[in-house]
Amino acid sequence: RQRQMCIRDRHIAGHPEGSKEIDPDGTTANVDQALSWKNEFSKRTDASMAITTQFCFDSNSVIEWANGIQKSGIDIPVHIGIAGPAKLQTLLRYSIECGVGASIKILQKRAKDITKLLLPYKPTQIISELAAYKSSNPDFNIEKVHFFPLGGIKQVSQFVKEI
């Protein structure tokens, strides 16, 4: 007897800061078109979907992107990607490898402050800013946080316990 497999939940990629690999010209045309197609797919099927984004460090970019996709009719819930606690060098390396644009500038600014170079990065600021925005805008489409354990699972787990 053959068993039928069923995928109930689908998570798709979101790119609040674009993707140079998908849109080498620096626009978000291909990323936007793909997200629109996936949104239409979710409407015409029984697909339960969520958008899980690349990791981000800048709440303004996230808020602008999330509001923009919502205004364009994309109603798939968003799980925002956040880099967990890690050394600055680790975050810069992953940011460059993954092409998280605007966020690299935030990390570079932090790298110039010698006192912050010695301390591990913690995503407290972006989490606080997004939580405050969600609190005053309940229809904001970010529903969950997805932590990328770039500094290790133990560090992320400890951070989550602290917040």
Residue positions per predicted region:
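Short, small-residue-biased leader/transition segments that mark boundaries at the very start
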Residues: 1-7
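Active-site-adjacent beta->alpha loops and helix N-cap segments on the catalytic face
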Residues: 4, 55-70, 152-156
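Active-site mouth loops of central-metabolism enzymes
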Residues: 11-32, 112-124
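Active-site beta-loop-alpha junctions enriched in small/polar residues
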Residues: 13-19, 54-58, 81-87, 147-152
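Active-site glycine-rich loop that binds ribose-phosphate moieties when present
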Residues: 23-45, 61
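Conserved, mostly hydrophobic/aromatic
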Residues: 38, 47, 80, 145
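Short helix-capping segments at alpha-helix termini
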Residues: 44-46, 70-75, 137-140
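Catalytic-face loop-and-helix region of soluble metabolic enzyme cores
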Residues: 76-140
